[in-house]
Design a protein with these regions (language model features):
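Non-catalytic alpha/beta scaffold blocks inside enzyme catalytic domains
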Residues: 1-203
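Long, compositionally biased stretches
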Residues: 198-218
Length: 218
């Protein structure tokens, strides 16, 4: 829950703490730059050298030096009409801290793309639904809580070229006039390895207030 890590850190800063995530893909997502203040590989977005490294890898002239929006920020912006579109993949609105607000955000957003394996609340409200294959139908890599890589075991090899999230994002990028160069899992994995290990600074621990849960529905 939000605030747990801050509470542990406040109790005793000398204690070594390890985070074992609930979902298999969370460590890899953070390493890929999921958090609004991070670039891939744990590079901080306001670090000039980090931005130069990533801009060079992506073939970009420059990158913004301000953090992006987290999930709550994106949903709030969508509710306020400040986002033109949302691309939502594998998110259950009922799992969000504010399910009602999340539903309002999706319903109020001008254009919603749902990338899904199965029917969901988001796909029911989406303008475009792009189905993707199951986990066991495509290759890939997970990082465990110790950052050790583990390959995904492909069980169903029937589709020769499964429509996975990589292909969907590459296609969307192409339609928007940008060439990602990441049309396959192998290309994405190579791009990740080519970035190398970040040798610069890392973000400092900031305090996060605890989440006050909503009253249960009766």
């Amino acid at each position: 829950r939000p605030g747990t890590l801050s509470a542990i850190n406040d109790l005793d800063s000398t204690v070594r703490v390890a985070w074992v995530p609930r979902r298999a893909g969370e460590i890899g997502a953070i390493e890929a730059g999921l958090l609004p203040q991070l670039l891939p590989g744990g590079r901080f977005v306001d670090d000039a050298k980090a931005r130069i490294d990533i801009a060079a890898a992506w073939g970009a002239t420059n990158l913004p030096n301000q953090p992006g929006l987290d999930a709550d920020g994106m949903l709030a912006a969508a509710r306020a009409g400040q986002l033109d579109a949302l691309v939502v993949s594998g998110v259950e609105l009922a799992d969000m801290p504010d399910p009602t607000g999340a539903r309002e955000a999706v319903e109020n957003c001008g254009f919603v793309v749902s990338v899904e394996q199965r029917f969901s609340e988001v796909s029911a409200r989406a303008d475009v639904v792009l189905p993707v294959c199951l986990l066991e139908e495509t290759s890939g890599t997970f990082l465990d809580w110790e950052h050790r890589p583990g390959r995904v075991r492909v069980v169903n090899k029937q589709p020769a070229t499964p429509m996975n999230e990589i292909r969907v994002l590459d296609a969307l990028s192409a339609q928007m006039g940008s060439v990602s160069g990441l049309a396959t899992v192998a290309q994405a994995h190579k791009a990740w390895k080519d970035l190398g290990q970040w040798q610069g600074g890392h973000p400092k621990m900031e305090s996060t207030p605890p989440l006050v849960p909503q009253a249960p529905m009766v």
